């Protein structure tokens, strides 16, 4: 699938946060896609015509970003092109939560990507940012399956173990590196990468599982370089971009059916 992505070089339109925009663009280029970064409301119609997919990230949310996301969804939905929503921090504020719900209820979202706290928030299950509440009986498998069913999307939950679901089947993906949690933009790039894989028009559940596995394997490969060279967070960032640009063999990442 990665080989096909690099042959096609899909154009991925990103409405993302300004903290991570450069990293997202460079990451997509490394992976083999072409980034387009725009949040100009008046050009959403035109960009939807030429782009292969849309990734929306609400990391630096404001009134203008909300209007832009709504306008973009309208046009991408009309053209039946994949849309990925990354509801960053939607468990942290009413504005983020309500905006995420409004965008989801538009009916145009193809994939919903977030961590356990974010996805749990959107299905009414309270989670801590670092995992599920000890008093909450719901498991990641139950949360992601419910999210996929409730919003008719492919749900992608990232963490130490990733999970993907279409509402019926749930797959888990292990592997990766702890360094992913120590750099800004790893999740933002992951959402954009999800959009790039969905643009290939393959089975969406399998596409998301493959993307998660490749992403974790690239992180693992980058971590090996960091350890070999006595590096840390900064060097991991650059080694990770390098790893994304190289052939990626799934040696450390494992896809398993959970449900």
Swiss-Prot record:
Highest taxon of source: Bacteria
UniProt pathway annotation: Cofactor biosynthesis; thiamine diphosphate biosynthesis; 4-methyl-5-(2-phosphoethyl)-thiazole from 5-(2-hydroxyethyl)-4-methylthiazole: step 1/1
Ligand binding (ATP): 113, 158
CDD domains: THZ_kinase (cd01170)
Enzyme Commission no: 2.7.1.50
Keywords: ATP-binding, Kinase, Magnesium, Metal-binding, Nucleotide-binding, Thiamine biosynthesis, Transferase
The organism of origin for this protein: Helicobacter pylori (strain ATCC 700392 / 26695) (Campylobacter pylori)
Reactions accelerated catalytically: 5-(2-hydroxyethyl)-4-methylthiazole + ATP = 4-methyl-5-(2-phosphooxyethyl)-thiazole + ADP + H(+)
Protein name (record): Hydroxyethylthiazole kinase
Cofactor: Mg(2+)
TM spans (from-to): none
InterPro entries given in the database record: Hyethyz_kinase, Ribokinase-like
Binding site for substrate: 37, 185
Physiological role: Catalyzes the phosphorylation of the hydroxyl group of 4-methyl-5-beta-hydroxyethylthiazole (THZ).
Family designation: Belongs to the Thz kinase family.
Nucleotide-binding recorded as keyword: yes
GO MF annotation: an example: ATP binding
């Amino acid at each position: 699938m990665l080989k096909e992505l690099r042959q096609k070089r899909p154009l991925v339109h990103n409405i993302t946060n300004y903290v991570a925009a450069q990293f997202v663009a460079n990451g997509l280029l490394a992976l083999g896609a072409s980034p387009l970064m725009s949040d100009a409301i008046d050009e959403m119609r035109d960009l939807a015509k030429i782009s292969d997919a849309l990734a929306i990230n609400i990391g630096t949310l404001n009134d203008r970003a909300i209007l832009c996301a709504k306008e973009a969804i309208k046009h991408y939905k009309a053209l039946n092109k994949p849309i990925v929503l990354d509801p960053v921090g939607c468990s942290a504020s009413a504005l983020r939560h309500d905006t995420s719900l409004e965008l989801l209820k538009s009916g145009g979202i193809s994939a919903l990507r977030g961590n356990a706290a974010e996805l749990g928030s959107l299905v009414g299950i309270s989670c801590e940012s670092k995992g599920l509440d000890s008093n909450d009986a719901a498991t990641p498998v139950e949360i992601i399956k419910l999210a996929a069913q409730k919003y008719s999307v492919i749900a992608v939950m990232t963490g130490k173990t990733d999970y993907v679901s279409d509402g019926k089947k749930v797959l888990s993906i292990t592997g990766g590196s702890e360094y992913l949690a120590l750099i800004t933009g790893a999740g933002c790039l992951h959402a954009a990468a999800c959009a790039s894989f969905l643009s290939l028009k393959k089975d969406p559940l399998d596409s998301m599982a493959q993307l998660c596995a490749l992403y974790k394997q690239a992180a693992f490969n980058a971590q090996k370089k960091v350890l070999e060279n006595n590096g840390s967070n900064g060097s991991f960032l650059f080694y990770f971009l390098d790893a994304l640009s190289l052939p990626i063999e799934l040696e450390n990442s494992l896809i398993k059916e959970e449900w």
